[in-house]
C-alpha cells in the first residue's frame, strides 16, 4: 500500500450529508487511509437534525447535539484528524408520500435548498486549507436519492473545481453485489426515501440505488478493518441502535454486507486506488 509521504497534498477530504453516512459508506476506507499515513478530514453538510429520535435522547438534548457527539466518537475510531460541519439544516425526506400528505416542506436553511455556489465556496475553503489530494462525495443519485445526498454530489463537484482538487471519488454502492447479500441499511433507506420507486420483483439490480458493477471504478476490501468500521457505526447509536438490522448481523454476514466500499472516480488515479 502506497504511503503519501510528508508534505502537502496528503489530505483526503470526505464530504457527507449526515452523521453516520461516513461510517456506513466510507468508514473502512477512512480507516485504511489513516493507517497508511494519509490525513483524513471529515466534513458534514448538516448535523442530521431530521434523523430518527429515540428514548435514549432526552427532551433536553437536541438531536443535532447528540449526533455531533456520536460523530466525534466515530471519527476517533476511523482516524479522522479534523471534523467540520458546514452549518446547513438536514432537509429531511422529500418523497412522494411526504408531498402528498403535506409533510414535504423543508426547514429554513435546508441543505437541499442551499445555493450550490455558496455551499461549494465553504467546502472549497476547507479543501484549500488542507491542500487536499482528493475529495470523496457521492454519485449523481446521491447513492439512494435523498435530496441532501444529491446536493452533496453537486456541491462536491463544484468545490473540487474551485479548489483544483485533482481527484474526486464518488461514494456509491454496487447494487448488483447487494442483490446477493443480507439487507444493507442503504436498501432500507431507499424504501423510506423513495417508496414510490421501491425494489420490485427484478430485485436490487433494477433498483434506484447506487451504480451497476461495470460503473464502479474502485472496490475497496475493508474487511481487514471491519471491527473498526463496526465500532464507528455503533457509535451512531441514535440512528443505528443495537436492535438495528446492521448491528444484529453475525460477523460473517456483517462482513458480506459491509466489507466492501465502492467508488466511481473523476480525474487521475488517487489515494483510494492505492487500496484496491
Briefly describe each language-model feature range.
Residues 1-13, 98, 106-276:
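Metal-dependent de-N-acetylase/amidase catalytic core
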Residues 1-131, 158, 264:
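Active-site rim/loop-helix segments in enzyme catalytic domains that contact anionic ligands
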Amino acid at each position: 500500500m502506497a504511503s503519501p509521504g510528508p508534505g502537502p497534498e496528503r489530505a483526503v477530504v470526505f464530504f457527507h450529508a449526515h452523521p453516520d453516512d461516513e461510517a456506513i459508506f466510507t468508514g473502512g476506507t477512512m480507516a485504511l487511509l489513516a493507517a497508511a499515513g494519509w490525513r483524513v478530514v471529515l466534513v458534514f453538510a448538516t448535523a442530521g437534525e431530521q434523523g430518527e429520535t429515540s428514548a435514549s435522547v432526552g427532551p433536553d438534548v437536541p438531536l443535532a447535539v447528540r449526533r455531533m457527539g456520536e460523530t466525534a466518537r466515530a471519527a476517533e475510531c476511523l482516524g479522522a484528524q479534523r471534523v467540520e460541519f458546514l452549518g446547513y439544516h438536514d432537509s429531511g425526506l422529500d418523497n412522494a408520500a411526504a408531498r402528498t400528505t403535506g409533510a414535504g416542506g423543508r426547514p429554513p436553511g435546508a441543505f437541499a435548498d442551499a445555493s450550490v455556489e455558496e455551499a461549494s465556496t465553504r467546502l472549497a475553503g476547507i479543501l484549500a486549507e488542507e491542500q487536499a489530494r482528493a475529495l470523496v462525495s457521492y454519485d449523481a443519485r446521491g447513492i439512494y436519492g435523498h435530496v441532501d445526498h444529491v446536493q452533496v454530489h453537486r456541491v462536491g463537484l463544484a468545490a473540487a473545481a474551485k479548489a483544483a482538487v485533482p481527484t474526486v471519488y464518488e461514494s456509491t454502492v454496487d447494487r448488483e453485489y447487494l442483490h446477493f447479500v443480507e439487507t444493507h441499511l442503504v436498501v432500507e433507506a431507499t424504501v423510506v426515501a423513495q417508496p414510490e420507486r421501491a425494489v420490485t420483483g427484478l430485485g436490487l439490480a433494477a433498483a434506484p440505488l447506487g451504480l451497476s458493477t461495470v460503473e464502479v471504478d474502485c472496490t475497496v476490501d475493508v474487511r481487514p478493518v471491519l471491527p473498526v468500521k463496526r465500532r464507528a457505526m455503533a457509535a451512531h447509536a441514535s440512528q443505528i441502535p443495537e436492535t438495528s438490522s446492521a448491528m444484529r448481523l453475525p460477523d460473517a454476514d456483517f462482513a458480506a454486507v459491509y466489507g466492501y466500499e465502492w467508488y466511481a472516480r473523476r480525474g487521475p488515479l488517487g489515494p483510494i486506488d492505492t487500496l484496491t
